[in-house]
Every structure is written in C-alpha cells, then in structure tokens.
Amino acid sequence: MPSVKGTVPLGYWQFTVHLDNLFEEYVGQTWYNALSAKHEWISGKDFPYLVRKDGGDLQHAIRPDHIFRHVGGDSLIIVDAKYTAEIGKPDEIYQMLAYLNYQHSDKNPGQQLRGFLVYPGQELAFYPVTGFQHKLLCVTMPIPYSPTTPGLLEIVDTLTKESWEYQAIC
C-alpha cells in the first residue's frame, strides 16, 4: 500500500555499516590466511599500562588490531588497519610506535618487531617509514585482495628477515 506522508507510517528500515570495522576484520583475515602456516594470530587483546598518580594509579590499555607471532618466536608483527585514503598520518605513526615500544610479556629477547599500518589501495604496495628504532611500514592493499607474485607471505617474510635497507617492493 503506498504511503502518504503524514497519514500512513512510511515502511522502510535502515542499517549502518561501519566500514572501518569491516576493513579491520578484512585485513586481519587476509593476513591470517597468508601468514597462518608460520604465525599465530592474536586479535582483540588488551595490553594494560598504568599512569602512576598520587591518590591512585590510572589504569588504561592499548589494543593493536592484529598481532602475528612467528611460530619460531623470532618475530612479532603488529598490524593496524586504517580505513582512510591518507597514509602515514602522525597520530597513526604515534599509535603504532606505542604498540611497538610496549613491553610485551611474551616477547622473546632478540625478537624482531615489525609494524604495518594497512590502508585500502589500488595495489599491494609497501612504503617504509624511516627515522625510528623499529621497522615500520605503511601498506596499501586492494579490496578484494588476490594473492600476487610475490604473495603477501613472501613479502612479509622478506621484510621481517632483511635489514631495514631494502629496495622498494611492488
């Protein structure tokens, strides 16, 4: 039955899709599919810290989107998804540096830390962020992602094993 404004309620419904959350899940699942043979996936884990204050400490936590711990224990990969067109904004770099500098209780001595800020893009491409102690890269990843040669696993393996002075990949 047709609706007439003001006399009959309009028959419709709506829903909201949080594309940033959807992209975060997509990135996690895609990286897990590529890395699962050699890495354990940790997602949604809080890492607590304290702000020491007279009269009582303030408890807070940081939560990286995704962590991939190498089965052999020699690397820890932190992946944070950013659903935005502008890559490498200062607040995103600060956030990743907090994740990389956190004193992870399960971190082994000598374990290499790598940070990947992942953005939607037209092609799989890696852009190094220089000037910091830890290896940090901005990554653009197409939606949908289809494995290419070299694939995501091979590229991440290469980046986690080589020195920071590497040639651009992709």
Please identify what each model-predicted range represents.
Residues 7-170:
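Catalytic core segments in nucleotide and nucleic-acid processing enzymes
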